[in-house]
């Protein structure tokens, strides 16, 4: 999927200069929340703590960057690491992958103005390899449709903080 055009949001602008390279430009003091390994759909994800951190970021106008493994997505029959007993009850359905992506979209929509970057982790790249779909690109596209400015990055890469 294509990256969005640079747009100012949360006091900053992000421009993709390649799949794994982004320039983050801001004119004034900017706060950031950097998180990773959320494993949102895992039964052990501490969603109360996640909500607390995202609400704090929202209150401060901080830009949120999520660096890999937002998703767990290990409970499909195609993943040898899966364990059905670890599956959250709301995802026990025939369309497991879609249910998790839809739930993520619903959850992150309330934070669409501060979620600025989603980076791929091994859980996302595993789904891309086995299922030929990108959950993060799907989420980011909907957040942009709803007025956000979310960029997707690769498994590795660079963020350059400075002028565009």
State where each predicted segment sits:
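Core catalytic region of metal-dependent phosphoesterases/phosphodiesterases
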Residues: 2-7, 19-35, 40-153
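Acidic, low-complexity intrinsically disordered tails
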Residues: 11-13, 17
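Short, acidic/polar N-cap/turn motifs at the starts of alpha helices
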Residues: 154-158
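Short, intrinsically disordered, charge-balanced linker/junction segments flanking boundaries
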Residues: 159-164
């Amino acid at each position: 999927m294509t990256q969005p055009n640079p747009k100012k949001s949360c006091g900053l602008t992000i421009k993709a200069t390649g799949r794994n390279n982004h320039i983050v430009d801001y004119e004034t003091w900017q706060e950031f929340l950097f998180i990773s390994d959320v494993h949102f759909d895992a039964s052990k994800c501490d969603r109360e703590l996640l909500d607390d951190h995202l609400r704090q970021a929202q209150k401060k106008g901080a830009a949120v960057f999520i660096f890999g493994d937002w998703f767990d997505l290990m409970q499909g029959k195609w993943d040898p690491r899966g364990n059905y007993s670890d599956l959250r009850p709301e995802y026990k359905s025939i369309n497991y992958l879609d249910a998790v992506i839809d739930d993520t979209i619903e959850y992150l929509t309330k934070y669409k103005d501060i979620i600025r970057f989603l980076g791929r982790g091994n859980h996302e790249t595993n789904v891309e390899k086995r299922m030929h779909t990108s959950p993060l690109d799907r989420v980011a596209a909907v957040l942009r449709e709803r007025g956000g400015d979310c960029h997707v990055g690769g498994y590795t890469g660079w963020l350059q903080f400075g002028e565009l």
